[in-house]
Amino acid sequence: MPFYIIGGLMVLYRYRWAGLWMIVCAVLAIVVSDQSSGFVKHFIHRLRPCATEQVRLLVAHCSDTFSFTSNHAANHFAIAAFLSLVFRRVKWLPYVLIIWAGFVALSQVYVGLHFPADIAGGALIGVLAGYAAFALFKLIKEKYFAESNI
């Protein structure tokens, strides 16, 4: 969490009002991906891997919500997609962000909370939410912050 707060403060300091809207759109990407992923869970009632006795021993707590899709994957891929598009001039950044989101998502498989398909579904939802948030940010930027160097 401190990483995200420090990053947000750096964006605010560097880009001022445009940075504030960037943060608003990033938060919107997370909210949309999280809610969309939660919505899908109500239709696909897949139990978590930790619901079986063999896996339950690997995690301290097995959530009572359904498994497909992974909210962790959706949220982190939403941020990765959004920031990759916003800072597309930084050529190495998308690789770092996708690897970071991938590690977060795969950790959910490692601890027995999700199946690989759960994180793939979450990643898809997240990338779509990230693109949608970027489209909104682009409209706001073009209308109000055309001179900004983002």
Q: What spans do the regions from the language model cover?
A:
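Membrane-interface interhelical connector segments
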Residues: 45-59
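Interfacial segments of alpha-helical transmembrane regions
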Residues: 6-36
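Membrane-embedded catalytic cores of phosphoryl/pyrophosphoryl-handling enzymes
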Residues: 15, 60-150
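Transmembrane alpha-helix/helix-exit interface in multi-pass inner-membrane proteins
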Residues: 30-48
